């Protein structure tokens, strides 16, 4: 199974890179290939619907809010996220309302027809390895 891990992090923080490496390493057990893409830097030729599994990783979360950036859903729709695509949603635990933030991201993506089979809130690399083992 081919999978794509689309992450959203404007700051390109070191913690995000650490979590991405742990996710990718653990996902290789169930997936033939995992491609990592920065959601904010997707090219016009990057199409998500060619992958069997799509991981949406929101690595940035405002400290005091539970609303996801509306640009995330818009970017994913523009690059081929359509009804029937299967995948999971991962977010980073930061500040207040982290679980509600995850639910709001899931609701926004499910309204597009994205079928979510797994979700998690990551706190550290161990959480990322556990979540990566469930990709696919």
What does each of the following model-derived ranges do?
Residues 2-136:
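FMN-binding flavodoxin-like domain, especially the glycine-rich phosphate-binding loop
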């Amino acid at each position: 199974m081919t999978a794509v891990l689309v992450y959203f992090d404007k700051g390109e923080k070191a913690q995000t890179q650490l979590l991405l490496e742990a996710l990718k390493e653990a996902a290789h057990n169930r997936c033939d290939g995992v491609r990592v893409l920065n959601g904010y830097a997707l090219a016009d030729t990057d199409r998500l619907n060619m992958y069997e599994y799509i991981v949406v990783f929101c690595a940035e979360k405002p400290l005091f809010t539970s609303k996801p950036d509306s640009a995330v859903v818009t970017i994913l729709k523009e690059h081929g996220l359509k009804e029937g695509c299967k995948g999971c949603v991962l977010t980073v635990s930061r500040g207040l309302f982290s679980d509600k933030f995850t639910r709001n991201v899931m609701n926004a993506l499910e309204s597009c027809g994205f079928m979510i089979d797994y979700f998690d809130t990551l706190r550290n690399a161990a959480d990322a390895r556990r979540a990566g083992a469930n990709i696919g």
